[in-house]
Amino acid sequence: MAHKKAGGSSRNGRDSAGRRLGVKKFGGESVIPGNIIIRQRGTKWHPGRNVGIGKDHTIFAKSEGVVEFRNGKNGRSFVSVVVPAEMPAKAAD
C-alpha cells in the first residue's frame, strides 16, 4: 500500500522586530531634559551626573548640557551630562 503523510506545517518562519537599542546621543552632543541618551538591556552603561535611569535601564538627561562618556572603577562605563558654565551676556553694541 502506498501511503503519503499528511502535509504538516513548518515550525520555522517567525521572528521579532529589532528593539532599536543603543546610543541615541553621542559624546559631545547637546541634550535637553528628557532626551534619551542610551537604550539598553541591563546596565552596560551606568548613570553619572545629571542623568537618570528608567526601569528598563534607559539613560536620559535630567538637565541641559553636553553628553560625556567616561570609564570608572571596576571596568564600569558612565554617562554624564556636563552643564556648561554660565556664559556672561554679550554687551549690546
Curated annotation (Swiss-Prot):
Listed GO biological process terms: translation
Protein name in the entry: Large ribosomal subunit protein bL27
GO molecular function annotation: structural constituent of ribosome
GO cellular component: cytosolic large ribosomal subunit
Similarity comment: family membership: Belongs to the bacterial ribosomal protein bL27 family.
Residue segments, region Disordered: 1-22
Keywords (A to Z) from UniProt: Ribonucleoprotein, Ribosomal protein
Gene3D superfamilies on file: 2.40.50.100
Encoding gene (name): rpmA
Name of a matching Pfam family: Ribosomal_L27
Stored InterPro entries: Ribosomal_bL27 (IPR001684), Ribosomal_bL27_CS (IPR018261)
Record NCBIfam families: L27
